[in-house]
């Protein structure tokens, strides 16, 4: 049975304000793959629709690439999903790395929350360092010179993501697998 592969319009997350880590806290973890491969329709709060292809790759990860013709055609992310300790089972951490960057150890990883809403749906909560400063400070993390919140380790990241979940921030994107 096909399930949703909810996925992240992360191009905007690559700018200042995002939550990131260079320490790669999930490097040795196998991701959770709760979704089938397939075609994704993503809708933002502005009702703009973007289409992606999702496929499973090694180590419990996914590769998501944009299928709409245009400037970003073929660009995408490697995605991993992980349980968030202390949160309900339908709340997952997402980790995203841009495919157009080298796979070296210093490639930044971006983080947020994915809420599984149905067998074929999900929503994304994308943290912003400035707007979600209270949640980031839960682990003692503050904005750096580039405006992004860079977490020192996995424990700090998870503590702040749990605080973000508890803040009841509204999701910014919805995803449906077709």
Regions found by a protein language model. Name each.
Residues 19-36, 44-51, 56-178:
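Calycin-type beta-barrel ligand-binding domains and close structural analogs
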Residues 15-17:
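C-terminal motif of bacterial Sec signal peptides marking the signal peptidase cleavage site
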Residues 2-9:
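Sec-dependent signal peptide recognition
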């Amino acid at each position: 049975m096909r399930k949703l592969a909810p996925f992240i319009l992360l191009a905007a997350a690559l700018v200042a304000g995002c939550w990131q880590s260079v320490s790669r806290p999930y490097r040795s973890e196998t991701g959770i793959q709760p979704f089938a491969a397939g075609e994704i329709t993503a809708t933002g709060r502005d009702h703009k629709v973007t289409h992606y292809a999702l496929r499973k790759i090694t180590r419990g990860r996914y590769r998501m690439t944009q299928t709409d013709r245009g400037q970003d055609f073929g660009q995408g992310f490697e995605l991993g999903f992980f349980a968030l300790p202390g949160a309900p089972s339908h709340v997952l951490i997402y980790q995203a790395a841009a495919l157009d960057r080298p796979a070296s150890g210093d490639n930044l990883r971006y983080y947020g929350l994915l809420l599984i809403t149905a067998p074929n749906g999900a929503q994304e909560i994308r943290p912003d360092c400035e707007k979600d400063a209270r949640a980031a400070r839960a682990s003692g993390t503050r904005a750096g010179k580039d405006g992004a919140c860079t977490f020192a380790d996995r424990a700090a990241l998870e503590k702040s993501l749990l605080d973000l979940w508890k803040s009841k921030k509204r999701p910014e994107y919805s995803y449906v697998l077709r």
